[in-house]
Amino acid sequence: MIKLYELVDFLNRYLDIDKFEEIDPIVNGLEIEGEYTVSKVATCVSITNNIIDEAIRGGINVLITHHGIITRRNGVKRIVGSFKEKLRKILMNNISVLAYHLPLDAHVEIGNNVSIAKVLNLNIIDWIYEKNIPIGVVALCNDKASIYDVYKEVKSKINEKAILLKYGLDRVERIAIISGAGAKFIKKFTKREVDLFMTGEFREDCEVYAIDEKINVIVMGHYASEVFGVRNLARLLREKFNIETVFLRSEQII
């Protein structure tokens, strides 16, 4: 069996968490220390009370989440209500909690953005940077595709409830992809640079920009755009350490 801190050390190095220190609101790495020996690992996008209950029923003692429960910006001011219940169940059941946020969006092998491009059979040609850190990708269709065909693929392979904002060309070639809450990054582009911008959730001011710049937008859904990294992580750990892993799906819609 692998020890907890062996797992933490491997993931911290593999996902290169130190370089995201300045820009990530989430505390990456080990957030809550549980048992020292890893018996069964679950991955998830966010930790709800239902996810914790499922982990307890499944004998999970390490929970790896994309959205951690400890943030730099907000901090923990009060431990009350549903948050208190979360912590109580985690601590009483000696579950370790690890979080990997931007490192798992950006990773060049198992990250959310790379995975979305692969699922849609797109060729990555460039990276989208924030403070010299790659947080998204620009990808190319082999042939200029109908925007409606791309949208159909997204609905089929990522989220049937994805939304198309058709403000640009009927046929698209260059596609920018940023999973999660990446709306603001559309303002890095003009219609001459990308034909389609894809992200997890969108904002009104960014929609105005898309209209004025005539850039198509597909809103994939925040949750749906971020299941890939944690799923890939579960598979990686299973293959590398021969430990039992499972992906826990949430009832989240947005």
Would you name each region that the model predicts?
Residues 1-254:
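Active-site catalytic microenvironments in core metabolic enzymes, especially phosphate/sugar-handling
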